[in-house]
Structures are given as structure tokens and as C-alpha cells.
Amino acid sequence: MSNQKALVIFSGGQDSTTCLIQAIQTYGRENVQAITFQYGQRHAVELERARWIAQDLGVKQTVLDLSLMRQITHNALMDDTAAIETAENGVPNTFVDGRNALFLLYAAIYAKGQGIRHIIAGVCETDFSGYPDCRDVFVKSMNVTLNLAMDYDFQIHTPLMYLTKAQTWALADEMGALDYIREQTHTCYNGIVGGCRECPSCILRERGLAEYLESKKAV
């Protein structure tokens, strides 16, 4: 995709790093940028990893401060004194209302100013925690809304949308990045380097990796 530019919404976690590496291979390193959001998340260690990975991969990274979210919403992802639990509706209390809507909005504003039309997000509705703003129907509706709001032809890509975590690990392996993503990315909601293996994010990550490695042995 020569002469086309892409912006990756980048957290430093498994999914967004997979998307960033795929974007580099698809569009070319010189045509890819990363945008990262600081919104008061308790797992701020991922911000450090995001900066390191972006620099290591040679990609320009922009970090935006959305910490104002603390003024209007409260949840366990932004309160390190709260226990991470699953609500009666099956959604963990780490869900941040409006987060992905805001991420896509600010990413689109930035992208238009940079002449970028392709926006890439690592959201997924297969192996996920039940967050409503990770669903394909939401992303598609947001794509239409942003195009109308800014009179611009954005294309929001979600390459992991229908992949299981095991399949996401397989994709990383296909790109020659399995070990890199295992060793360099951070996913833990509790902000523990190497993972706590107890929070919803760690459980999904470790279970998916185990499934993929087991299937790889069987081949």
C-alpha cells in the first residue's frame, strides 16, 4: 500500500502491538504512526512499554492526555484501590464508558491533520471481556459518524475483530514477532510487570498463548 498512511491506536499491549507490527509490514514503517492515550489507567506501566516499543520499531508516537476522564467516570481501571470484579451483566468493572469512542474521535482528529485516512484499532469481540465498545457494530457506526462529522474518508481497520486470542498469537508468529510480543508487551490491568495471571486481561492472554502453543505442537 505505497503512499498510504496509517495511524495505530497503540497501548503497548499484545493486541495493539500486533496491529502496529502488521501495519509496518503492510504500509511501510515510514507511513505508520502510533497514537497513545494517557487517561489515568492503573496499568500505567503499559505507557512506558508503548513508548519503548514505538521507539524500538522506529515509529513516530504521539501521546495525548485524556486524564479528564477521571472527572466524569469512575471504574476499577482508573482506581488502583478498587478490586477488579465482574458485574452481574458479565462485564468487568474495568470497563471505561466511552473510552474507545473518545480514542477513535481523537485519533481521527489527529489523523486528518496528518493526511492519514487509515486508522487501526486492536479491538476484538471474540475472546474479549464483554466491553460493548469493542464490538464490530460500534466500530462501523463510529466510522460512519466520523466521516460525516469531518467530511473525510476515514477507514477504520480492526484486523483482530474476529480472531481468538490463540489466533492473534498465531498472527504474531506468522509475522515473526511471537517472542517480541511475549517479551515486550504489557497487558495486565493490575500494572504488574510480567502479568498477575489473575485479572481478566492476563487470563485471556495466557489462555490464548497456551492454546496456540499446544496447537503448534500438534502440527
Swiss-Prot record:
<keyword id="KW-0436">Ligase</keyword>
<comment type="function">
    <text>Catalyzes the ATP-dependent conversion of 7-carboxy-7-deazaguanine (CDG) to 7-cyano-7-deazaguanine (preQ(0)).</text>
</comment>
<keyword id="KW-0547">Nucleotide-binding</keyword>
<dbReference type="GO" id="GO:0016879">
    <property type="term" value="F:ligase activity, forming carbon-nitrogen bonds"/>
</dbReference>
<keyword id="KW-0067">ATP-binding</keyword>
<keyword id="KW-0479">Metal-binding</keyword>
<keyword id="KW-0862">Zinc</keyword>
<dbReference type="InterPro" id="IPR014729">
    <property type="entry name" value="Rossmann-like_a/b/a_fold"/>
</dbReference>
<dbReference type="GO" id="GO:0008616">
    <property type="term" value="P:queuosine biosynthetic process"/>
</dbReference>
<feature type="binding site">
    <location>
        <begin position="10"/>
        <end position="20"/>
    </location>
    <ligand>
        <name>ATP</name>
    </ligand>
</feature>
<feature type="binding site">
    <location>
        <position position="188"/>
    </location>
    <ligand>
        <name>Zn(2+)</name>
    </ligand>
</feature>
<protein>
    <recommendedName>
        <fullName>7-cyano-7-deazaguanine synthase</fullName>
        <ecNumber>6.3.4.20</ecNumber>
    </recommendedName>
</protein>
<comment type="similarity">
    <text>Belongs to the QueC family.</text>
</comment>
<dbReference type="Pfam" id="PF06508">
    <property type="entry name" value="QueC"/>
</dbReference>
<keyword id="KW-0671">Queuosine biosynthesis</keyword>
<dbReference type="GO" id="GO:0008270">
    <property type="term" value="F:zinc ion binding"/>
</dbReference>
<feature type="binding site">
    <location>
        <position position="199"/>
    </location>
    <ligand>
        <name>Zn(2+)</name>
    </ligand>
</feature>
<feature type="binding site">
    <location>
        <position position="196"/>
    </location>
    <ligand>
        <name>Zn(2+)</name>
    </ligand>
</feature>
<dbReference type="InterPro" id="IPR018317">
    <property type="entry name" value="QueC"/>
</dbReference>
<dbReference type="GO" id="GO:0005524">
    <property type="term" value="F:ATP binding"/>
</dbReference>
<feature type="binding site">
    <location>
        <position position="202"/>
    </location>
    <ligand>
        <name>Zn(2+)</name>
    </ligand>
</feature>
<comment type="pathway">
    <text>Purine metabolism; 7-cyano-7-deazaguanine biosynthesis.</text>
</comment>
